[in-house]
Amino acid sequence: LKKILPESPIILKVTPVDPPEFFFKGWQQKVRIEQVFSGENLASGSEIYITFDRWKASVARKEMNLSFVNFMKDGAEYLVFLSESIGYTKDGIEVFQLPKDHAIASVFSYEVHDNVIYPVSGESTYVPYKEVSDNEFFAVDTEGLDAFLELKNFLLEKYK
């Protein structure tokens, strides 16, 4: 990802404007663009929605798949790598998506977070969200968390 993400057609620093909006089995979140590192026809101060094909939720099973990265929190700044507009607007605001071919959501907080590793066992890696709700990343061991943090630090140095 260190090589792939910097080649993304759209790289932005954003701040969430609203909490995530759930629809069908997924969600999207409205953000304000703070800085454009790459991408055409995008400007600081404008608002867009961000979505990801891998963000899934099942109300019946009480499960969410956040692609290893937590929701963006109000008032914080994030570095996001987007692939394209999905050709759809919500309330006149264009919707962009994270790259489909990545299992990990390409969203990185400019803040430092305390990440809790919640013990898992058996076949499932699902954990109670309330136990990890302040995390930036979700990992099952320190090796995985260290890899996320190394990638984050590399990217934040590049896109300050």
Regions found by a protein language model. Give the residues of each.
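Conserved positions in beta-strands of structured domains
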Residues: 15-18, 34
